[in-house]
Amino acid sequence: MDEQNSTVFQAFEWDIPADQQHWQRLRRVLPQLSSIGVSSLWLPPACKAGNPRGNGYDIYDLYDLGEFEQKGSRSTKWGSKKDLQALASDARRLGLGLIFDAVLNHRCGGDGMERVKVVEIDQDDRRKVVSKPYDVDAWLKFDFPGRHGAYSGMRYGWRQFNATDWDHRTRKNAIFKIIDGGKDWAHDVDKTEHGNADYLLMNNLDYTDKKLQDDVKQWGAWIVRELGLAGFRLDAIQHFSHKFSNEWMTHVQSKSNKPLFFVGEFWSGNVQLLTHWLDASPAGLHLYDAPLLYNLARTSWSKKPDLSSIFDQTLVQARPQNAVTLVMNHDTQYSTHSLT
């Protein structure tokens, strides 16, 4: 993607109807988007969710783009794989890049349960254990039966996860850290959020597992080829292994015949925290300028706004070459939880 004055358009919002027609609607407006100067489209997570109405952040199967009968539907909320490929073809013809929202932190909608030993973790401090070890029945088996091994034969089990949020035996919701096999949180994640940001929600992936690493790297290279992608948005980048996200970007880029664009979602108003993350990442990684968004929000609330300080302590000021500016997205809508 040509980064000179480029404009990435978020091609979805949170409350779009789950009518499986979104790819078709989006395809019809591609010429208009191109004509007004849009460079690339940020697509929602197009992978199969845990239910037909899921937006894809509740991800079930990376390799099912609306092709297989799984979790109550063949298509995703957004549409079928055939419609997505038609959208990608038209976008390429018009010179529009596609940025894919990659949800690599967690999984949802397991196909079966496994009994694992856990400890409960404090909701506000992930370093604090609040129970003795005990067994839970967790939905950690992901067999992807509708896909029948197409594209990948990988199946997930407890070894690919280090935490879950539901014990089916007691019908209890909590943060359960798996301790079988000596498991622990990833240590190369953000430490300013809850003491350790590894756990966010659902079934948390454990990137110390080599099989998991290899499969997710393979998926990244596969989907670039499958859709002719221009790049990726990395969802919740501070919540999973920094080492792995670096390796993943490097691997996917090495398998592509063109430069790819990478932008990470790291919600923090601390610009020093963002620049430190960038310092330990591949040079091509960008981050959303959350500090600028917070400045804009505070200015909009103020009775005496001072626009002369709007760029103070922002990423576009500190690292303009790595900043992606924004004024809102699906996380800042009225129907979602947001600090803005």
Indicate residue ranges for each PLM-predicted region.
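N-terminal anchoring/stem segment of glycosyltransferases
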Residues: 23-26, 38
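Boundary/entry segment of secreted carbohydrate-active catalytic domains
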Residues: 1-20, 197-209
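Aromatic-lined carbohydrate-binding/catalytic grooves of carbohydrate-active enzymes
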Residues: 34-80, 96
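Active-site-proximal helices and loops of the catalytic beta/alpha 8
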Residues: 2-6, 25-32, 52-59, 66, ...
